[in-house]
Regions:
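Surface-exposed, low-complexity/disordered Ser/Thr/Gly/Pro/Asn-rich loops and linkers
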Residues: 57-59
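Beta-sandwich interaction modules
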Residues: 294-297
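Consensus positions within tandem repeat domains that build extended binding/scaffold surfaces
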Residues: 112, 122, 131, 140, ...
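Glycine-centered beta-turn/loop sites at beta-strand termini
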Residues: 78, 87-89, 97-99, 107-108, ...
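GD-rich hexapeptide-repeat beta-solenoids
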Residues: 1-49, 54, 75-78, 83, ...
Length: 317
């Protein structure tokens, strides 16, 4: 396909009127990325132009192309010049990105599409309003689902996963990653790294992680699951709502902050007789439970403890 050359204003008009109705915040992020990478200047009235290729794509990306507009499923190998890839709104496309340490910005359209990153760049992907699937690669990527019920998977780098609005599924990869569900009833899952941060946001969320992770439920009736026997320490914050914390581990020194609402901590395979000592700290409004196998759990703002032999109600301090 022929290459055209577009100023920032012409690119913005193209995104408005040529089947690429990318929301304003994503358009702004795209332009900022192109300015940061030196394609455009951030000075007012900048008339510099970017090399732009649009239409069906196949084969190697021409060396001079800086922005690629795709209209069908394809594989793209990144180059130092390629800075952005744009989807149209038709949906049903899969983009596979391969290559080295070249950073690329990907803006998906309104349809339900898939992006798979196999490269080593620190890429940025913005989903559209469809139900998108995004998979991270080997770099430190930023993956945003946007509206819709999205599925986002982290890669091997230190990625940021943001579901946006909708009922999303976020799964951490092997790096130290940040998972944020956004609004909606989301599922956040990390069973590999133990160095991730899981933030539910608004909605009734499910946060599944391992020892060493940090959990924050946000608003809504959230459910937390903590696995692993590494002995690493986790902090779990419920936020507003009636939250339930399931500790599926017998090691470590964990801290659970229930927040507003009626909250419950469930101790897997533990009876109340496994608790050998309880410390009460009225200054911090907390209870510290000591178990016979050296596990300790600090709880505050929690109303109930569930054991195999019954529930214990904790009075407010």
């Amino acid at each position: 396909m022929a290459i055209s050359y577009l100023t920032k204003t012409e690119l913005d008009q193209f995104l408005h009127h040529n089947g690429n109705h990318i929301e304003a915040s994503v358009r702004s992020a795209l332009i900022d990325s192109l300015e940061h990478s030196g394609v455009y200047s951030d000075h007012p009235g900048d008339t510099s132009k970017a090399a732009f290729q649009s239409g069906p794509f196949g084969g190697a990306v021409p060396a001079g192309v800086q922005i690629l507009d795709i209209t069908q499923s394809t594989t793209v190998e990144t180059t130092p010049n390629l800075k952005a890839i744009i989807f149209d709104d038709a949906g049903g496309k899969t983009l596979d990105v391969i290559g080295g340490h070249n950073d690329v910005f990907i803006a998906m359209g309104k349809g339900s599409d898939s992006v798979n990153l196999y490269d080593y760049g620190n890429d940025t992907v913005y989903g559209g309003s469809g139900n998108d699937a995004i998979r991270g690669g080997h770099g430190n990527s930023s993956l945003f689902g946007g509206a819709g019920n999205d599925s986002i998977y982290g890669g091997s780098g230190n990625d940021t996963l943001d579901g946006g609005s909708g009922n999303d599924y976020l799964e951490a990869g092997t790096g130290a990653q940040v998972l944020e569900g956004g609004s909606g009833n989301d599922i956040l899952r990390d069973l590999s790294s133990g160095h991730s941060t899981l933030i539910g946001g608004d909605g009734n969320d499910t946060l599944i992680g391992v020892q060493g992770d940090v959990f924050a439920g946000g608003d809504g009736n959230d459910v937390f699951w903590v696995y692993g026997e590494s002995g690493a320490n986790s902090t779990l914050q419920g936020g507003n709502g009636n939250d339930t914390f399931h500790l599926q581990t017998h090691t470590g020194n964990d801290t659970i902050i229930g927040g507003a609402g009626s909250d419950t901590v469930d101790f897997a395979d533990r009876s109340s007789f496994d608790v050998t000592k309880v410390d009460v700290d009225e200054k911090t409004n907390s209870y510290t439970l000591h178990f016979g196998d050296s596990q300790t759990v600090v709880v505050s703002g929690v109303e109930y403890l569930h054991f195999t032999d019954g529930d214990v109600h904790l009075p407010k301090l």
